[in-house]
Amino acid sequence: LYDMADGHLILKAMVNDGLAPDDTASYLTGGIYTKDRFNIGYGKVEVRAKLPSARSVWPAIWMMPQKGPWPDAGEIDIMEHLNHDRFVYQTIHSRYATTLKQKDPASYVTVQVSPEKYNIYGVEILPDSLVFRVNGWKTMVYPRLEEGMYAGKTQYPFGEPYYLLIDMQIGGNWVGPASGEDLPAEMKVDWVKVYELKDALED
């Protein structure tokens, strides 16, 4: 479910009270993704968005690989927000961090925000690190390990073609059971900017 108003993309989370009679789901959510349409390798992604505060609602801005299994091929969570939290999560997933549960370097950070205001969530995908930002402020650097038994794709699978997802979800083990208590809810996206890393293109 989505709408456009005043140049903003609006992604919705709603109770399915007859809006989609042929859909048996109790709730309906909106989302967009660039899979098989647009790839991002080394570069920078920024999204200016305003988030809902609603029970069991889970808006996210994230990236997944075009090819490869999860979590070995990686996942980059530029922003995830849960319920009525006044902070967001920025997280990476890989075989090293998720399957092997290695905690050095740290794979996530929480960042205080005012979700009801527009904030800019971003990540720089570089050959040697991921750099996360909120409103231009550096929040976490996830470096590529150059030595050790897990150095390489196991720890740092990033830089391969990834696609971007911006979506709303309702319910789950992390955010809690689905609830229509605070619905409908909306995530508003002002703009999305993607930059390619010039040096990587020239290699």
Identify the residue ranges that each predicted region occupies:
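GH16 jelly-roll
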Residues: L1-D203
